[in-house]
Amino acid sequence: MDLQLPRGTRDILPEEVSKWHFLETEFKNVCENYQYEEIRTPVFEHTELFERGVGDSTDIVSKEMYTFQDKGGRSLTLRPEGTASVVRAFVEHKLYGEVSQPIKMYYNEPMFRYERPQGGRQRQFTQMGIEALGSDDPSIDVEVISLAMEFFRKIGLTNIKLVINSLGDKESRLKHREALVAHFEPHIDEFCAECQVRLHKNPLRILDCKKDHDNPLIQSAPSILDFLNEESVAYFENVKNYLNALEIPFEIDPTMVRGLDYYNHTTFEIMSVEEGFGAKTTLCGGGRYHGLVREFGGPDTPGMGFGIGVERILLALEKADIEIPAKKPLEVYVITAQPEAELKGVTLVNKLRQNGISAEKDYLKRKFKAQLKDANRKNAVYTIILGEEELQTGNYQLKNMETGEQEAVSETTILEKLSNTKGEK
């Protein structure tokens, strides 16, 4: 019997959780500053949702999904990405009927993909993302990009670059598709078996192939930018103008198509350019989608969003030597110097905690010196010593663990003393 972690998963131990809390808090604060509200969706959905939403020609659907049958014979899939579930909820709960548009939502949830585990890539991973539904204005595209860039600035990741592209509207993509088929078809035998299937199913996916990405025919493939109609060109120009107005630098990569079938018009990636982190490591990716709500049974509703892999962000912070704020420090360790002080120790610790002061005590009946050593090990700012004299007088010995200074403080003033000291920090 194998009782160890399944491959591609990991435990987040207590000493690591503060890093996750830091990212989650910063992301929440940035999103809510932009007036995005949190949404939470089920960890599994009907398989058809992802087949229709993500696209059955994508690697995600064809190779990476965790799919199973429940006891009722229904095909269910652990969610591999966030957008399809959010859009499904948008349609199912008729959020498109809301007076205030666009509907702006963010999420922070586990996703699952069966792929080879490596640095920053796990089979269970956490994705933070946003979706803005109900506006086809290019300014919302730039708001979404700006939010992502602001999040990276807040957490200290500045060695990054923004890469954008346009996939155009349906008319533009159809013309580009025809050109791709004509370009690849005479040489399709030079490509992997999957790309040979993709040629007539969805040739755009050939540009995104992991096996053939170095093939010169991909590098010389017709650019989508040459097939944009007048409307799509104008849309992309507006996106670029807004980015310039916000002084957000960007590069254009016409080969960037993203790994999902639902995108149109704007697509973007934010990449790390940190030395030693790997060339073009994508930290955030997203884009615009116009047909997904209709595909799920709702009215024509445009959308725009992105996803960020938390594990990859943590790795990027580590590579960049960015220090993440530590967990909340232990402010007071209450030392009970004799058994008779135990009851008072329990009530004092409880009183401190109820007043917002982080407090701890010994639970192993250790001797005085062992408790003092434990307080040091836990980096307590202060200790309060409860001995026979303290129990009789009601005055406690408050010791500053950094300076060694010690003073007697009455029970009635101890909370005020600690609160004042806390405010000075």
Curated annotation (Swiss-Prot):
Subcellular location: Cytoplasm
GO molecular function, one term: ATP binding
InterPro entries attached to this UniProt entry: aa-tRNA-synth_II, aa-tRNA-synth_II/BPL/LPL, Anticodon-bd, Anticodon-bd_dom_sf, His-tRNA-ligase, HisRS-like_core, HisRS/HisZ, HisRS_anticodon
Alphabetically ordered keywords of this record: Aminoacyl-tRNA synthetase, ATP-binding, Cytoplasm, Ligase, Nucleotide-binding, Protein biosynthesis
The keyword Protein biosynthesis is annotated on this UniProt entry: yes
This enzyme's EC code(s): 6.1.1.21
Coiled-coil annotated spans: none
Family listed: Belongs to the class-II aminoacyl-tRNA synthetase family.
Binding partners and assembly: Homodimer.
Protein name per UniProt: Histidine--tRNA ligase
Originating species: Listeria monocytogenes serovar 1/2a (strain ATCC BAA-679 / EGD-e)
